[in-house]
């Protein structure tokens, strides 16, 4: 039985977008060995069929003699190893999609999403993995969370850790800072208008604040940030001691966009604890062959989405006004749409494999995001704990308790029952009613009441507005194309559809500038004719303006009571 699984990654012609992978096993005794490519990547809950990028599979023994093998399903190859002492499988992988969950190789650099590149060996998943990297001449830097050995040699204690460690190869700008003697490396891949010192200072502030929240202990030997600076893009993906994120390369001089990016940094770094260590039982050890279902993604992502902006406030990257403006976006993303009455948080978590990554124009009318609604419910839960304990405790304490659970037994995650129990212990009372209404149920969230408990006001900016269709529209070369029709609004009830082109309102030709001005002439109860282009046919519809759907605004009260101020301080400061 081999002690290690040895991988070699070779990038010979980066302009082809291919890499070559070899997997070597020595001292084998099995009559056959199965090699499989994962079908999904942890943290991104969609079957992605990474085996589609695999080509030219070969198998041989230690002398280079070809071994018989067959493909036994969509992502697995079975090699005949009877009477053989070693086996090597070789294949090419096509890498030409730069996202946080896929791989790219080009003449500038390579980003390797390990779960979509490296097969695992059935029965050998717990063995140490060693990776040798052969990169093109002139590429001098490798950034990864893997443990570094000799030149271009890296290792992981098992396959789970191995593929939870993406790899960036090229000549990226690497910035560094230390916290308590632990090195943090920031890989900035691509051109951008950032300043090294600003990036280092802000990333360090965020890391220190989150480490403090969890008691000051650092759960890793080193940490790697991989930031891809792109023309257009965004998003991030957490890993065990690293994360990868995308940012538009020219955002760094725009204060609002830069702070939004720092929210992403805060989010992905927070996952170090919430999901990578404090995790639902279904999320590790992983089954890479199929969906891994859980009803607790609203905790894994929703709690993290609540804290990502709170952390920015705690380390003074945001002030109170800016923080509440960020929160306001989440409130409107949920409270304006009927999807909050159609799908519970538990259902949203469970169905992520078939819904969340396959959004259509009706998504907001029929579903909720376990990120966004999860963050709102987390806010309410936090305030419930604060109120019930007279601000002597908060959700921070529940997180720390769950983290202590993890440290006692790192082999398994929490059950839904244990997670709720911890919240009840911290809150000092049963919370079955809260879960039934807001996690497993679809009752209206009492956001206004909970915010008011903390001296924060929620108002409706559309209360006195008029002439609102309640649609989302894009300007397509001067054409006004409806992209989303909000259920319950004027357009929805009048029969307008997504993909309709607005041509005229009440006999007047509209354009992107004129449309808004014309709509202001109409009030609730007015009826007008709307001319549209629907799939190449011109149609005229009658619409009656309804009361506009709410558009919320959150502001901090200037006249908080002593109790409201105490609760607000606990929410913001922990």
Where are the regions a protein language model picked out?
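Acidic/polar loop patches that form or flank catalytic/metal-binding clefts of enzymes
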Residues: 141-143, 218-221, 281-282, 313-325, ...
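C-terminal recognition in membrane/secretory proteostasis and scaffolding
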Residues: 308, 318-574
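Hydrophobic residues positioned within well-ordered beta-strands of beta-sheet architectures
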Residues: 5-7, 19-23, 87-89, 129-131, ...
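Early extracytoplasmic/domain-onset interaction patches
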Residues: 1-40
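Non-catalytic architectural context of zinc metalloproteases
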Residues: 47-56, 60-220, 232-233
């Amino acid at each position: 039985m081999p002690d290690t699984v040895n991988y070699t990654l070779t990038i010979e012609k980066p302009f082809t977008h291919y890499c070559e992978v070899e997997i070597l096993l020595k001292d084998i005794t099995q009559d056959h060995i199965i090699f499989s490519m994962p079908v999904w990547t942890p943290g991104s809950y969609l079957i992605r069929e990474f085996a589609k990028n695999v080509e030219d599979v070969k198998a041989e023994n230690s002398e280079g003699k070809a071994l018989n093998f067959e493909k036994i399903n969509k992502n697995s190859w079975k090699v005949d190893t009877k009477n053989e002492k070693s086996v090597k499988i070789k294949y090419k992988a096509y890498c030409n999609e730069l996202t946080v969950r896929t791989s790219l190789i080009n003449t500038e650099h390579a980003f390797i999403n390990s779960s979509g590149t490296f097969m695992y060996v059935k029965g050998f998943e717990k063995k140490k993995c060693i990776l040798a990297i052969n990169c093109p001449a002139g590429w001098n830097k490798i950034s990864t969370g893997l443990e570094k050995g000799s030149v271009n040699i890296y290792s992981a204690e098992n396959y789970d850790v191995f593929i939870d460690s993406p790899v960036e190869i090229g000549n990226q700008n690497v910035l560094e800072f230390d916290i308590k003697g632990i090195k943090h490396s920031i890989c900035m891949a691509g051109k951008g208008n950032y300043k090294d010192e600003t990036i280092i200072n802000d990333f360090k502030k965020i890391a220190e604040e989150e480490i403090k929240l969890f008691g000051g202990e650092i759960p890793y030997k080193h940490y790697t940030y991989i930031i891809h600076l792109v023309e257009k893009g965004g998003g991030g993906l957490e890993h065990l001691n690293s994360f990868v994120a995308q940012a538009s390369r020219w955002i760094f001089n725009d204060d609002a966009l830069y702070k939004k990016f720092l929210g992403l940094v805060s989010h992905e770094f927070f996952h170090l604890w919430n999901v990578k260590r404090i995790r639902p039982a279904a999320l590790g050890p992983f089954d890479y062959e199929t969906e891994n279902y859980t009803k607790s993604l609203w905790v894994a992502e929703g709690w993290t989405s609540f804290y990502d902006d709170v952390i920015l406030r705690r380390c003074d990257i945001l002030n109170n006004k800016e923080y509440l403006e960020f929160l306001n976006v989440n409130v409107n993303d949920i409270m304006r749409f009927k999807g909050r009455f159609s799908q519970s948080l538990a259902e949203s978590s469970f169905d992520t494999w078939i819904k969340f990554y396959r959004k259509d124009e009706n998504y907001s009318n029929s579903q909720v995001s376990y990120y966004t609604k999860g963050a709102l419910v987390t806010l309410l839960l936090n305030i419930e704990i604060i109120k019930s304990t007279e601000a002597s405790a908060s959700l921070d304490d529940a997180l720390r308790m769950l983290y202590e659970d993890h440290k006692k037994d790192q082999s398994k995650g929490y059950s839904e029952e244990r997670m709720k129990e911890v919240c009840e212990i911290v809150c000092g009372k049963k919370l079955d009613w809260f879960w039934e209404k807001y996690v497993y149920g679809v009752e209206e969230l009492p956001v206004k009441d909970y915010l008011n408990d903390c001296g924060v006001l929620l108002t409706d900016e559309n209360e006195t507005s008029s002439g609102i269709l309640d649609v989302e529209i894009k300007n397509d070369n001067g054409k006004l194309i409806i992209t989303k029709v909000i259920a319950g609004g004027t357009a929805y009830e009048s029969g307008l559809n997504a993909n309709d082109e607005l041509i005229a309102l009440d006999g007047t030709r509209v354009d992107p500038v004129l449309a808004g001005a014309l709509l202001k002439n109409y009030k609730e109860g007015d009826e007008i004719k709307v001319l549209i282009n629907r799939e190449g046919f011109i149609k005229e519809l009658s619409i009656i303006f309804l009361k506009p759907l709410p558009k919320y605004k959150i502001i901090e009260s200037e006249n908080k009571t002593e109790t409201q101020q105490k609760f607000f301080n606990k929410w913001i400061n922990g």
